[in-house]
A protein has these predicted regions:
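Sec-dependent N-terminal signal peptides
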Residues: 3-15
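Terminal export signals
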Residues: 12-15, 31, 93
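Acidic Gly/Asp/Thr-rich repetitive segments characteristic of extracellular carbohydrate-active
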Residues: 17-50
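Right-handed parallel beta-helix/beta-spiral solenoid domain characteristic of secreted/periplasmic
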Residues: 24, 59-107
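Detector for repetitive beta-architecture
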Residues: 39-41, 46, 52, 58-60, ...
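Glycine/Thr-rich phosphate-binding loops of Rossmann-like dinucleotide-binding domains
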Residues: 51-52, 71
Length: 107
């Protein structure tokens, strides 16, 4: 599994951009998703995010857990436990709009 994850990142990173959330440019996960293009990675820092997310692109949406020392341990359980998307208390927390796309979600 570790090798598959690493391969996905190598392939997606050849011409892809990593968008860090939150940052001065992207305060919300959805802002990062909106700014992304197919092949990009939206990398979410620890925190509680009250958002309803809509994915319409082939991107990687991930917590920092997948980026923490990939050579020795690719899962950081503390980071996963501290990165929460709770929704905005209405509707679905995550909607993938197009059944023909394949976003990747980690951590």
């Amino acid at each position: 599994m570790k090798h598959i994850v690493n391969l996905l990142f190598v392939i997606s990173s050849l011409s892809a951009t990593t968008i860090n959330v939150p940052s001065s440019d992207y305060l919300t996960i959805q802002a990062g998703i909106n700014a992304s293009v197919d092949g990009d990675t939206v990398l979410v820092d620890e925190g509680i995010y009250s958002e309803n997310l809509i994915l319409e692109k082939e991107i990687v949406l991930a917590s920092h857990a997948i980026y923490d020392d990939l050579d020795s341990e690719w899962i950081d359980n503390d980071n996963i436990n501290n990165t929460i998307i709770s929704g905005a208390h209405n509707g679905s927390c995550l909607v993938i709009k197009d059944g023909n796309i394949g976003p990747t979600i980690f951590g």
